[in-house]
Amino acid sequence: LIMTSQAYRQASRRLAKIDEIDPDNRLLGRMNVRRLEAETLRDSILFVSGQWNPRMFGKPVPVMEDEVGQYVVGVSTNDSSNRPTGKTVSLGTDAFRRSLYVQVRRSRVLSFFDAFDAPAMEPNCTKRPTSIVAPQALMLMNNEFVLAQSRAMAGRFQRLAKGRLDAQLGLAWESALGQ
C-alpha cells in the first residue's frame, strides 16, 4: 500500500521553493534519496537489462564458486574431490529471478551481495552495515554478471530504438534513472 502512495512515488528532485519551506522534508514534498541495498541493486540491474524473471515461488536459485573463487549464481559440477569437471548446467531464466530467491548460506554469500553489504547470516543481525568503498565500484565495472546484463541492456535498447543512437541514449537515461 505504501508503494502506491503519492509520497512514495515522488521524484527526489530538490526545488529551492520547497527547501525554503521544508528544509528537512518533514512534509514529504519530495522523495528522499536512498541507497539501494545489495538485493535491490541486483534486481534493478536485471529489470533494466530486460532479463528479469518475475516468477514467484519454487526452488531457490543455486550459488556456486566460480574459477576465481567468487560465489556466483549457478550449479556446481565439481566432482567428489571438488575438482572442476568442465560440465555446465544451464539455469535458463531461473538465473534471473529476484534476489529474494537466491540461495543463502553463511559460507556461500553471493559475491555481488557481499560487496554491497548484504546482511550477516548469523543469528543476531540487528543492523545492516552500510559502506561506500572502492570494491563496490570495481564490482560494478568488472563483475561478469554486471557486464552480461549491460550487454543485454544495450541489445534491448538497440532493438527498441531501431538503431537510432539518440533514441538508445534516451532509453538508457530513462531506464537507469527510473524517469
Show where each model-derived region lies:
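An acidic, gly/pro-interrupted, aromatic-rich
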Residues: 7-177
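Short, functionally critical alpha-helical segments immediately adjacent to catalytic or ligand/cofactor-binding
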Residues: 1-4
